[in-house]
Every structure is written in C-alpha cells, then in structure tokens.
C-alpha cells in the first residue's frame, strides 16, 4: 500500500543486521516497482570491521536492493571513519550508497562532510527548525557548505528559508505543548560512550 499511495523509496532494516529478516520486504518492494533501500544498522565493536560492512553490502546488492543506506541511528560514525567506510562500500557495490545519521553526539555535520568527500551519493538532512539533537544536520547548513564546490546541490537558500519560516512556529508550538522535548534538541557527547540510539 505504501508504494500505491505514493511512497517511492522503501527503507528496510533489521536492527541486528540479520538480512534474512529483510528478504520478504525487498521482494515486495521490487514486485511493486518501488525503490528498495536496505539499511545497514551502523554500530561499533570488534566484529564490525570494514570487511563485515562490505560483505553485508554485497549481500544486500545481490538480494535485489536498489540502494544501501548506512543507518547510524546513534550518531556514532565519526568523520574519518566515515571516509573509510564510504570509500570501502563504494568500491564494493555498484548501487548508490546513502548516509543517515543523527546529531546526538555532535559530529554529524563533520561526518557528512567527510562522507560526501569520499563519494557518498545522498545524505539525509532536516530543515533547521527540526534539525540537530536527535535529528539530522540542518539542510540549509549542508547546502551552504557545498555551495560552489563539486558537491553543490543547486538548492535555493531563499526557498529553504521560506520553508524554515513555515515550520518554525510549528516547532515552537510543539515545544510549548510538550510534544517536543527540548532535551532532544541538544548534544550529548556521552552517546559516544553508551552508544544507545536517540533518533
């Protein structure tokens, strides 16, 4: 139903990176002519080497995924590690690779910069009223960062400012009503120690 209702990219993931749990969803997305994007749930530990990630990426490509997303749900991927990971994945597979991270630990914008320089195809961002903290880096900041470089997005900052102006009072209402917790909008460097996702 998602594809029939207009969703074009179906991001599919298993928090334990057990690809057997993804096969049915990938087949269904392919059957319905959707874009099956399989996410690799990024985490840290001795087992999670570049070989681990590249093997998984190849398996995902062979499964029929249209693209891969590095899903860094806790904001653990550090900038220079992003360079290594993206470089390895881009060599391992032919399909596009996207990066999704959270600003929880405070390093996300730097991670995106290094990932883009390493050849990542897409980065996930959020409009500034809802950016940072457990969300993503601000769209406007990333657009301005890459302006005039080979990575220039071509997006119009005036239009982005209008969009941000539209959403700012919605954010303020959500804060005032308690729907949005202000604690979620800050940085907690301890995330790099306890490694629990917050986004």
Residue ranges and their predicted role:
Residues 1-11, 15-199:
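Catalytic cores and adjacent flexible loops of soluble metabolic enzymes
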């Amino acid at each position: 139903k998602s594809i029939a209702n207009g969703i074009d990219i179906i991001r599919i993931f298993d928090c334990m990176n057990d690809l057997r749990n993804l096969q049915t969803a990938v087949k269904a997305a392919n059957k319905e002519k959707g874009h099956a994007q399989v996410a690799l749930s990024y985490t840290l530990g001795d087992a999670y080497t570049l070989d681990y990630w590249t093997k998984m990426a190849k398996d995902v490509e062979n499964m029929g995924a249209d693209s891969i997303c590095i899903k860094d749900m806790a904001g653990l991927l550090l900038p220079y590690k992003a360079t290594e990971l993206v470089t390895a994945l881009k060599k391992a597979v032919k399909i596009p690779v996207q990066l999704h991270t959270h600003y929880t630990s405070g390093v996300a914008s730097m991670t995106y910069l290094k990932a883009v320089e390493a050849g990542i195809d897409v980065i996930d961002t959020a409009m500034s009223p809802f950016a940072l903290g457990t969300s993503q880096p601000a769209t406007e900041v990333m657009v301005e960062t890459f302006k005039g470089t080979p990575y220039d997005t071509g997006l119009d900052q005036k239009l982005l400012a209008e969009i941000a102006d539209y959403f700012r009072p919605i954010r303020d209402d959500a804060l005032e009503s308690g729907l949005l917790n202000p604690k979620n909008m800050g940085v907690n460097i301890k995330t790099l120690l306890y490694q629990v996702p917050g986004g």
